[in-house]
């Protein structure tokens, strides 16, 4: 990350000069948009389904900064924009309203395949890479199952990056500063693009970006935490600190130490892409690409609603009258009791070998990617809403003897959820694409992907050990870390397919496309779950599933002249 922080020094070191070329364009001239949605270069008007594009130059000129803003430029697409914290975790893109998972599933990746597939060049991956040095973005609306397979029920979004250019040495540096409502800080972003020839038939293209955006959300109820000494129940870690100490009865009655974390949802992203082009022969090219991105986000970009309970400065006991006063949350205020940071690392490597034959093009694509991430979520409100803290079943802060008073309600409930996930996949695809013929043209191919996913969660009920020690008068420790819930699931998924499309040009203005995709999916999963605070578990389970079938498509296109 330090390398990217110092990337601004490159601006001074390189002193890249930029030639500004003014070009006069006839505003009445129609410019055909070339796309590759059908695996061959063709115009938008010749594609037999609904497609929209946005060029990389348009993305830059419109100062589009993120994927949520990009998709708002296309008709018929919606996405839930909760900021960078959740942007790379779950694919919630919807085309024509079609969705698979609940909109509430944002903090955690899920097993289900999304309804809209995303590709970076020819690699199927949902990565939320920065929108840097793109040639164009293609949005294909409607089912794309025959060519793009699983996850393309609603459509497909393709991010096409710029290839290296042979014999060209040029570069650019772009510095962007931003200001947002709700924050007094200024955001900064630096982008470097450099294209250089290595030999007559080899070229290299570098894209490096670093952005540091300020937050706008104020966490106004953050508990100060620390470690509790061993008074008989063992030491406890990361527990909300009572203002008046941890003795009895202060541990029960003392108000928490609260502070406000202003502009907590900061965003820091470092991105780099290397791309090599090898012009092996006149009709054989090899492109190697490697892209990496690291995200660090300070908190959730979400404002709280409802009543805000403000701890008064003169409060000495949580059970005294007037300890709290009621207020309302401001426009950019969040009431979580803890900061909710997240981090994510994603890397992608791909090889694309293209052979331009006599009347056809053969393309072999090999790619791999890896995504890892973790985040913290405040589960306190969720537990409180269910009545879990004082439930006789859960037993965290249960007044078993019905004493009431200071034992009736936990003083400083604090439930932390720590989540981690990884996703790895290797993908191979080979296809033959015919040139556009007078009567017929076709695409045939094979696809294979092996994917491994891992997800885990640990939930902690902080302060429960000491609370129960004082209540019961004995060592009540079941788990030294006060961990309530431990969950882990691992999955291995193999997806293979053969597919094809045949287009018949019955006339100059009418085409019919027939498509099919024969697929096979195998999925193995194992789960491990335990409730450590009750000393229950682990419970384990394994499952295996297989599915296969054939997708079929018939699509007509009529040109109106």
Labelled PLM ranges:
Residues 28-166:
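Acidic, small-polar-rich N-terminal luminal/periplasmic segments of exported/outer-membrane proteins
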Residues 25-27, 31, 52, 123, ...:
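Membrane-proximal, glycine/serine-rich, low-complexity loop/turn segments characteristic
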